[in-house]
């Protein structure tokens, strides 16, 4: 991933940090390289935080911009997925990711209704 975009300095300038193996972007790259068939069958890739929100709201929850930058996949100048970092990570990655959204912009709905229907 790092070599594909021009080195650690480029990754750091784009995402705010160098690509460290434990970060999500490098882990996605590792998953793709180790098992391309399983990666191809993967429909959605979330962080735990956005996945839990998705379960609670019953829809795809966005990934916070700060979390996305910590994945080494969000550009800190545009606060959106960085196409060069995505392409260096795995093919068609953008299609597997939810949208990016600044923190503090919550969703007001949830999938779990605590009150049963009253008829």
Give the predicted meaning of each segment.
Residues 1-4:
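Short alpha-helix plus adjacent loop in nuclease-associated cores
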Residues 8-119:
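Gly/Ser/Thr-rich active-site cleft segment
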């Amino acid at each position: 991933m790092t070599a594909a975009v021009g080195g650690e300095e480029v990754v750091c300038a784009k995402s705010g940090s160098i690509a460290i193996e434990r970060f999500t972007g490098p882990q996605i790259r590792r998953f793709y390289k180790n098992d391309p068939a399983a990666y191809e069958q993967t429909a959605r890739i979330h962080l735990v935080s956005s996945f839990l929100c998705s379960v609670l709201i019953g829809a795809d929850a966005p990934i916070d911009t700060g979390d996305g930058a910590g994945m080494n996949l969000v550009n800190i100048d545009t606060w959106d997925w960085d196409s060069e970092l995505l392409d260096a990570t795995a093919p068609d990655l953008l299609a597997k990711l939810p949208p990016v959204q600044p923190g503090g912009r919550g969703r007001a709905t949830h999938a779990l209704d605590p009150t049963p229907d009253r008829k």
